[in-house]
């Protein structure tokens, strides 16, 4: 069972929330031109494709993981991405991440080991330390270590006390950290919201629809002609039609 999500357009509703959010303006036109072709190839391979416009591809995968993980027919859900925002989706060993670059599977214990907090605190962590890949600046002086130290104790940004003298954990430069957070707490909460993946994308497919039954010969032949690679047809081991 496979689903593939794409940012059909790179802008999303998050750009309306924050002007600095990623836009794709730095993506080379030659790369952008390949996006529609890749979507067509995925569909021709017989995969379920979710092309996102208002939401992001990450939201589609988070929604699918949330929707299908309780299904007793599902043994495990593997999100094939090393992106740290997906860590918030991990649940025990039932919903895990696959870092294909390092060929590593990250379960809930792995999230704690890698980021210092549980999955539920990942949006807070990114809200504090920022996420340059998504254009989230974070709060000055709040790096991963200090953010994880406080969130391991308090779980959420909202729960971090304003007075650093009342913190029950030690953090280097606590006074400065507190001053920066208190002067930008609203911004931190906005960044947290930006980093929170949506689990309510209106996906219409059922678990049965996600079952891979083979590539679609006609569709793939058309794409192969377009890109000038007939060899792709020879590499297909299973056809749906």
Positions of PLM-derived features:
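Non-catalytic nucleic-acid-binding/docking modules located in mid-to-C-terminal regions
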Residues: 3, 70-73, 102-241
